[in-house]
Amino acid sequence: MIPKDKEIVIIGCGIVGLALGRKFIIEGYKNIKLIEKETSVASHQSSRNSGVMHAGLYYEPNSLKAELSREGIVLMKDYCTKNCIEWEECGKIVAAKDKNEINRLENLFARGKRNNLKGLRLLNGKEINFYEPYLDGKAGIYVPEESIVSYFDV
């Protein structure tokens, strides 16, 4: 643990640097410096962020990535709600474009179930079109927990 009287320097004011600075302030650190070479924050990688809050569909069950993804989406939604930042639980569809991809889709669905994703549904082509009329898929997975937020608002 860093003693609270020490100076902390964070290089880069993207979303990670700003989140670290915020965390240190909350933890009671007083002497924090954020250094950014650009004239505004989040000018590089953070500005290319799609804003997706991932539910953890793709990660190996019981892996650190799966665990952090599940924990992270809950924390992120809570943070946004508490700070009046708009976010949307819009869901996501992962589609198989042909019969060859259906087996991989079914394996991905099983992985999502093992990662405790809520409300996962396997879809046929007609069910896909209920959500996305112009998506041509033979089968799909509906992931209702997937959400989006504006990185800039965060």
Residue ranges and their predicted role:
Residues 25-48:
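Glycine-rich FAD pyrophosphate-binding loop
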Residues 11, 35, 95-96, 144:
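Short hydrophobic segments within beta-strands
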Residues 2-16, 33:
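Beta1/beta-strand and adjacent pyrophosphate-binding region of the FAD-binding site
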Residues 141-154:
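Helical element adjacent to the flavin cofactor pocket in flavoenzyme catalytic cores
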Residues 51-131, 137:
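Dinucleotide-binding Rossmann-like beta1-alpha1 core, especially the glycine-rich loop
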